[in-house]
Amino acid sequence: MKKNAFYAQSGGVTSVINATAAAVIQEAKKFPNQINKVYAGQNGILGALRENLIDTSKESKKLIESLYYRPGGVFGSCRYKLKSLDENAKEYKRLIEVFKAHDIGYFFYNGGNDSADTAYKVSQISKSLGYDLTCIAIPKTVDNDLAVTDTCPGFGSVAKYVAISTQEASLDVQSMMESSTKVFILEVMGRHAGWIA
């Protein structure tokens, strides 16, 4: 039976998160017998909780294609970690309520470890409530620390950016070191992982 899909962005934005959004929207159109519309959550999962859904079918093909080259998070992202099912069943039930209201049968959550955990929890609550929902976590993290994932989209971009920035900073230090500083400290992202450094 044909259902709608819900896509949301989570965590820090990378130069690949919008490309992933474009791919989800375009690929969904290749399955018209299974997926009707793709809704995007305004500001991530908060968009579902607040019922702020963007109907991507109203956007032009040209605009969706432009997402491949657009930085930032076009639909808005969030750092909102849903608590455990035991601690906050109300929020999970709210998600399912919104999904039912918009006939959503597919949930794509684009982010890191917390997003994958949320997709898993939503799949568990949907099963327990008897609601047929396919939940898919889409990896995206510059941290490159997702379990059983070799390389995350986002990591290659940041690795290149940090390498180039370090080279450029070294030229600055080199040109000033005779009469000025000889030390340069570069702090990079990566949370508890050190892949970027």
Residue ranges and their predicted role:
Residues 177-197:
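Conserved anion/nucleotide-ligand pocket segment
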Residues 4-14, 74-79, 105-111, 137, ...:
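Short glycine-rich or small-residue beta-strand-to-loop segments that form or flank ligand, phosphate
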Residues 10-12, 41-46, 79-80, 112-113, ...:
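Short, ordered loop/turn segments at secondary-structure junctions
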Residues 1-53:
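N-terminal phosphate-binding or glycine-rich loops at protein starts, especially the Walker A/P-loop
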Residues 20-24, 113-133:
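Short Gly/Thr/Asp-enriched flexible loops that form oxyanion-binding sites at enzyme active sites
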Residues 1, 6, 30-33, 65-69, ...:
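Solvent-exposed alpha-helices and their adjacent loops that cap or buttress functional pockets
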Residues 51-105, 114-115, 142, 154, ...:
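Glycine-rich oxoanion-binding loops at beta->alpha junctions
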